[in-house]
């Protein structure tokens, strides 16, 4: 069973994020191309756990990260379930949506309320989480009013 370093918060600086109550580490880990189907699970796990052992508490994903869209969230979810679940309250997990994920009028690139809500639901399922700390829009499109996107993210 994974036991994080007891000194993990001693050397990492944390900064307040805007006007929110979040304090983000000076260094975050983005899980894009190194967390897809072509990558070794043990290496992915080592990257995440080593980062956490050194005070990295923010892990950034997106619904389309892979390769194979969604695969980074699936792999992170497995690592989270097997190792980090007891430390959920110490983590900042962010994900985003905006690129094509499924066929049909609501699965393509966009920022509609329908697309963003469905994308968030799918991301939560892939990661096995009840919530993410930050959800944001990855790619604006001219066919969705900015107000619709902003109200959905509020």
Residue ranges and their predicted role:
Residues 1-91:
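N-terminal binding-site loop/beta-alpha segment at the start of enzyme catalytic domains
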Residues 29, 61, 95, 134-137:
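Conserved beta-strand positions
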Residues 57, 61, 95, 144, ...:
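Ser/Thr-centric signal marking residues that sit
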Residues 88-101:
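A short, structured active-site edge motif that brings together acidic residues
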Residues 100-154:
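Glycine/proline-rich, positively charged
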């Amino acid at each position: 069973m994974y036991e994080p370093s007891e000194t993990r918060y001693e050397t990492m600086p944390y900064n307040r994020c805007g006007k929110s109550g979040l304090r983000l580490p000076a260094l975050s880990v983005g899980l894009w191309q190194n967390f897809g189907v072509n990558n070794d699970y043990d290496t992915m796990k080592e990257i995440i756990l080593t980062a956490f052992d050194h005070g990295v508490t923010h892990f950034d994903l997106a619904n389309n990260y892979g390769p194979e869209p969604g695969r980074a969230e699936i792999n992170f979810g497995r690592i989270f379930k097997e190792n980090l679940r007891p430390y959920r309250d110490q983590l900042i997990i962010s994900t985003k949506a905006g690129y094509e994920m499924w066929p049909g009028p609501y699965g393509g690139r966009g920022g509609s309320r329908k697309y963003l809500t469905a994308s968030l639901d799918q991301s939560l399922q892939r990661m096995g989480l009840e919530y993410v700390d930050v959800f944001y829009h990855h790619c604006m499109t001219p066919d969705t009013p900015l107000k619709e996107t902003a109200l959905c993210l509020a």
